[in-house]
Design a protein with these regions (language model features):
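A glycine- and charged-residue-rich anion-binding loop/surface
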Residues: 1-208
Length: 208
């Protein structure tokens, strides 16, 4: 399956062939030849949207295949048009990139690791393995918003193994095989499978 969200997180519509469709506990389970729907994972919620005339209500990855949960069936072999709920996706991209910026700055300054985070409609929560005073958070907020104002490029690459072994990065160092590294210059270098904005300015604002 071609995971189009790794080609570009800004793909909003696509066409693909229906490979399988079966009824399950959460509705119909559909796999495609390619998809731009991001499956829940790495702290980021799943995309929603439309496949043809059926609604995609959830997306998960199983055994390397992205499974789309829908409210109706689609014929196997049919070409179908997918449309991402872009407002939802872009908010997740802003939140995820903002979380990287904050987590990276806190790791740099205090050595604390992000041990969990949750993206919500109105707020994002991040858990660290250390205590931060309010003044510390205000300093991080100021630094993060300064870097947002700089509109820094955010990159996602798959380094070669020798390059990866020599790289200093946050999180998921136990991963083997191809590892995707998301970088914000001066802010964060982290292994991540999620979708991100192209530049820090698109995060908008960090506010504790």
């Amino acid at each position: 399956m071609n995971k189009l969200y790794y080609d570009s997180a800004y793909i909003k519509e696509f066409e693909a062939q229906v490979l399988s469709c079966q009824e399950g506990k959460k509705g119909w389970e559909i796999t495609l030849s390619a998809t731009a729907f991001y499956p829940e994972g790495g702290g980021q919620p799943a995309d929603t949207g439309l496949l043809g005339n059926v609604r995609v209500t959830d997306v998960h990855e199983k055994d390397g295949q992205v499974v789309h949960y829908t409210d109706g069936p689609l014929p196997v072999g049919e070409m179908v048009r997918g449309v991402i709920d872009w407002d939802r996706r872009f908010q997740h991209m802003q939140e995820h990139s903002g979380e990287h910026l904050v987590s990276g700055l806190i790791h740099q300054r205090f050595g604390y690791d992000n041990v969990g985070f949750h993206m919500g409609t109105d707020e994002v929560t991040i858990d660290f393995n250390g205590v931060l005073e309010w003044g510390d958070l205000m300093a991080i907020e100021e630094k993060a918003n300064g870097m947002i104002w700089e509109n820094l490029e955010i990159s996602a690459v798959y380094p070669e193994k020798d390059e990866l072994d020599a790289m200093e990065y946050r999180s998921k160092k136990e991963l083997t095989g191809a590892v995707r590294i998301v970088s914000i210059p001066g802010g964060d270098v982290c292994a991540c499978c999620g979708t991100h904005v192209l530049r820090s300015g698109q995060v908008g604002l960090v506010k504790f």
